[in-house]
């Protein structure tokens, strides 16, 4: 295999590993709790450690397919959807998503992170999807992709969260996109809004069912300010420049995040991958410079 192809394959592999580590790190419940506190009105002003208790089961990371007809798993013969739906206090609701085809359907596009959250009333639930992007995509508009994802999550509820025409049982959905390497730190909430054009009739319905949150993270670590609480945490977690101890220090001292073995391990592994990617990029740059120099000398001699 050509050396340049080998390097490209290795770089792609490391990028993929980095992406998976980023998702795994974001998938820790305490990190998700900080995201919820800073993006969802009902959880504002709450202690993230309390919010952790509202996250049901374990979040699914790179498991649930986005593709039409694949988001839900097949029900077994004899399953009674009505009986399952009547038990609104079950904490295993997310298990009805399709987790069975991760190997059979390898290569399929999957949600980065998806999970259910029980609201403070103890009865209602919302569905949260978190997506991580290394930068704003160039091939497509990020909002368009977010709309596609959230529509898939909403439509997949039929047969899982509601049956027949009981659309009032649909759950509110938040699709939260974290976009790195932006020019500035930002936070946007994209949602439905009614506009009266003729008359004043009030149509019944829940306009808050679809919510897209886009979090822009700049390259620089933001100052320690209240408005940048979430941005500083995410920036520290996902930074390719900060050292392991600097990241852990911010997490522990500023955010009171318990540095358990698994989260400490994920931070270290991600930093190691970042270092490897930087070193390969540096070597590639040096090699390119050497080749350019050789070519110039050759032309000069001729």
Name every feature range the model reports, one short phrase each.
Residues 1-302:
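Elongated, amphipathic alpha-helical interaction scaffolds
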């Amino acid at each position: 295999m050509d050396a340049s192809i080998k390097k490209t394959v290795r770089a792609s592999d490391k990028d993929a590993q980095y992406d998976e580590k980023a998702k795994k790190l974001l998938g820790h419940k305490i990190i998700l709790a900080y995201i919820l506190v800073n993006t969802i009105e009902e959880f504002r002003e709450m202690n993230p450690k309390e919010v952790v208790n509202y996250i049901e089961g374990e979040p699914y990371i790179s498991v649930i397919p986005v593709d039409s007809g694949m988001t839900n798993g097949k029900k077994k013969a004899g399953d009674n959807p009505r009986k399952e739906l009547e038990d609104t206090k079950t904490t295993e609701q997310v298990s009805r998503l399709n987790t069975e085809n991760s190997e059979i359907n390898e290569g399929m596009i999957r949600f980065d992170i998806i999970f259910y959250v029980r609201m403070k009333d103890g009865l209602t639930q919302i569905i949260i999807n978190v997506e991580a992007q290394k930068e704003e995509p160039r091939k497509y508009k990020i909002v368009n992709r977010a709309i596609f994802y959230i529509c898939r999550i909403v439509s997949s509820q039929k047969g899982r969260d509601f049956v027949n025409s009981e659309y009032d049982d649909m759950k509110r959905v938040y699709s939260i996109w974290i976009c790195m390497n932006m020019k500035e730190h930002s936070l946007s909430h994209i949602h439905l809004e009614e506009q009266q054009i003729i008359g004043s009739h009030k149509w019944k319905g829940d306009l808050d069912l679809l919510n897209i949150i886009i979090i822009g993270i700049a390259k620089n670590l933001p100052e320690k300010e209240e408005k940048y609480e979430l941005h500083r945490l995410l920036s520290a977690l996902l930074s390719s420049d900060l050292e392991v101890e600097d990241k852990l220090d911010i997490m522990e001292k500023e955010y009171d995040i318990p540095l358990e073995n698994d989260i400490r391990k994920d931070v270290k592994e991600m930093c190691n991958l970042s270092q490897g990617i930087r070193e390969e990029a540096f070597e590639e740059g040096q090699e390119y410079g050497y080749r350019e120099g050789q070519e110039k000398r050759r032309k000069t001699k001729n």
